[in-house]
Amino acid sequence: MDREEILQKIQEITADRLGVDESEVTPEASFREDLEADSLDLVELIMELEEAFGMEIPDEEAEKITTVEEAVDYVVEHQTA
């Protein structure tokens, strides 16, 4: 998957999980501030991303993912070819 496809998938998952319009899920959007996710939302979102992209995101790494762009960066860097 290229970066654009990963962004699109993360936008779809985030919009679905948080019940927001996909147009609000911009790369610079903060999960907590802009998209109003709480801690449980974030845990569930990370689990969905792990499943969607077939990867494990350790808790200490998940805590560093605060924006949509950071989620995209993480997936791009850690996806298996």
From Swiss-Prot:
Protein task: Carrier of the growing fatty acid chain in fatty acid biosynthesis.
The organism's taxonomic lineage, starting at the top: Bacteria, Bacillati, Actinomycetota, Rubrobacteria, Rubrobacterales
InterPro entries listed in its UniProt record: ACP, ACP-like_sf, PP-bd_ACP
Protein name: Acyl carrier protein
Organism superkingdom: Bacteria
Coiled-coil spans in chain: none
Residues covered by the Carrier domain: 1-79
Species annotation: Rubrobacter xylanophilus (strain DSM 9941 / JCM 11954 / NBRC 16129 / PRD-1)
Keywords: Cytoplasm, Fatty acid biosynthesis, Fatty acid metabolism, Lipid biosynthesis, Lipid metabolism, Phosphopantetheine, Phosphoprotein
GO MF: acyl binding; acyl carrier activity
Main location: cytoplasm
